[in-house]
A protein has these predicted regions:
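Structural recognition of the beta-strand scaffold that forms the well-ordered cores
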Residues: 39-43, 71-76, 114-120, 156-161, ...
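Serine-esterase "nucleophile elbow" of acetyl-processing enzymes
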Residues: 28-79, 83-86, 94, 104-112, ...
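Bacterial N-terminal signal peptides that target proteins for export
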Residues: 3-15
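Acidic/histidine-rich helix-loop elements
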Residues: 74-99, 126-134, 224
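Conserved catalytic region of serine esterases and O-acyltransferases that act on ester linkages
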Residues: 36, 52, 192-193, 215-316
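A short helix->loop->beta-strand "cap" motif at the edges of active sites that frequently abuts
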Residues: 150-156
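Substrate-gating cap/lid alpha-helix
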Residues: 137, 167-201
């Protein structure tokens, strides 16, 4: 669900988006995908699975480029890592963290993405101090992921550095410093190997620090890990800026500026919620306690129905 932001410091934090380090070009108001990009896959953990930043991103494109069609597939899986690591007693001992290695090939075969956004790291350090072996496992996993996507013929790959970790006591220190190290390594791969990287971690950490300076109670994630709507809006705006979009600071208000727009945003969010569980069910995974989605064929039919509803609204 897309919910307007209310925190007074949010407009200030958005200023950092304009100056944050991007491994990409300048801001241009044009369709951000080439004609060869038809299906975009999002890989990640529970933050990606929640899907709000993806729905926001899609809704912006739907409202601003009604003549273009593109499909966003959310294949995020809660608890997942790319490192293959899992802490002892994870989830109260009910199950270990799922490993992307186990399912990636099935996802790629089923989705056949032209482009992939991948965001890993927050779970890969398994909430422990920086350690050479864990850090090496993350780097190895990211190398494997990138090369797997290249071998699968993915035309464009964009890595997103980890979300900020907001420690209850140390705020942007502690485990967030571990994520900073992971992020710095990932950003370095842009210069070293030409990877596309969006440094969400640096931008969000800076924005959080600005928010805290204005209001010590300001948080993106009440549980330290999972951002609420403000954090998802921040992420959406950052990604849109990376995709050369001129995005206003009040993007949420712009998207919801009319009754028609509100309906479009709601339809996009509903479609995303339905499809993510259908895709996870169709491609399979080893993470228990997940919602059971519709059979993929049925979900795709409903996807088309919702697309038709959106088109009708756009033509009014």
């Amino acid at each position: 669900m897309v919910v307007p932001m209310t925190h007074a410091t949010l407009k200030k934090t958005f200023l950092f988006v304009a100056v944050v380090f991007f491994c990409g070009g300048s801001l241009l108001a044009q369709w951000p995908f080439g004609a060869h990009i038809k299906r975009v896959l999002f890989l990640g953990n529970s933050i990606t699975y929640s899907g709000e930043y993806i729905s926001n991103l899609e809704a912006w494109l739907v409202e601003n480029y009604p003549a273009h069609q593109i499909e966003f597939v959310n294949a995020g899986l809660p608890s997942e890592t790319v490192s293959g690591l899992s802490e002892e007693g994870h989830a109260g001992g009910r199950f270990p963290r799922p490993d992307l290695h186990e399912r990636l090939q099935r996802v790629l075969k089923a989705v056949k993405p032209d482009m992939v956004f991948a965001c890993y790291g927050i779970n890969d350090g398994i909430y422990q101090p920086l350690a050479p072996d864990r850090f090496a496992a993350f780097r190895s996993g990211m190398d494997w992921l990138h090369q797997s996507l290249v071998k699968a013929g993915v035309k464009r790959i964009v890595h997103i550095t980890p979300f900020v970790y907001d420690d209850e006591k140390t705020r942007t220190k502690g485990y967030n410093d571990v994520m900073a190290a992971y992020s710095q390594w990932l950003v370095a791969q842009h210069k070293k190997r030409g990877w596309e990287v969006v440094d969400l971690h640096a931008a969000m950490t800076k924005a959080l620090e600005t928010g805290i300076a204005a209001d010590s109670n300001f948080r993106y994630a009440k549980d330290q890990v999972h951002p609420g709507s403000e954090g998802h809006w921040f992420t959406s705006r950052l990604l849109l800026a990376y995709l050369h979009q001129k995005v206003p600071a009040d993007i949420h208000q712009t998207l919801l500026s009319t009754e028609k727009n509100e309906k479009i945003v709601a339809l996009v969010a509903r479609r995303q919620t339905m499809m993510k569980d259908a895709w996870l069910g169709a491609t399979g995974h080893k993470r228990p306690e997940m919602p059971v989605g519709l059979p993929l064929a049925e979900a795709l039919d409903k996807y088309k129905q919702i697309a038709a509803e959106i088109k009708c609204l756009q033509e009014k």
